[in-house]
Amino acid sequence: LNRFFPGNEDSNTTSRVDHRLWREIFSHSDHIIDLHSAALGRTNMPQIRVNLANRLSNRSARAFGTEVILDSEGPRGSLRRTADDAGISCITYEGGGADESDPEAIQIAMYGILNVLRSLKVIPGYPSRPRFRLLASGSVWLRSDYGGLLDVLTPAGSFIEEGELVATVTDPEYPGKSMEIRTPTQGLLICTATHPFVTTGTPIGHLLPIIKGLKTVRRRLDEEGLLVLSGADGDPPWREDDDIEDISVEGVWEGGSPDAEWGENPESAAEEEAEEADQI
């Protein structure tokens, strides 16, 4: 459904459903919060995806109250991009994985929704805020150069150092011999693969390279190096917005956009963007 908005009443079933949803519900909305888990075969640490150039969406993303915010337009046909093009505030929350119930991701989503409602004065109170925000305009996909059985050693939400071992891939034809996948830079691992079998080019993880604000981020790591997220241990306290440190994660979306399909070829994504540009 999230690749066919705003839909077409004369097209296939999925496009017709999207057309009805857009026409009857979403096009009349002022603010949209789109809740997602990761696709099959991966898991996401809680994060917000938003086009920060949209003033109202920017406000909702910050009000949601989670630490990781990815600044991107969203893929063509997604609800977020369609709403953004229509001038409607829309943010996407990603947390947890498919076919599972992640209590932490659900709790953070619940607090985030309440925060946005408070910021809009729909319900009483003030939105709770994290100690810092990572405002990312770039990331790195870690991909396997080998096919075989995958063993992920570092969970999503971990802060990892340059050269740290993230996963191994073992070819069943060569038992006892494993290929290592190490991170090219330090940063926060916001997504990892969960499927035990990979082929060449399969993404293993999604990394936010962090250079600025290292001391601030490290102070929020637990004993295992996992980022302790706002809302994970109960309703977080209210803070003045001036007390929050905004940390820029600059760069490009290396190896694919944050919203790219899990197995998408980076060249295909580039071709899609070029095709779109030609149509404008």
Task: Write out the residue ranges for each language-model feature.
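Structured catalytic-domain cores with a bias toward divalent-metal coordination
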Residues: 1-280
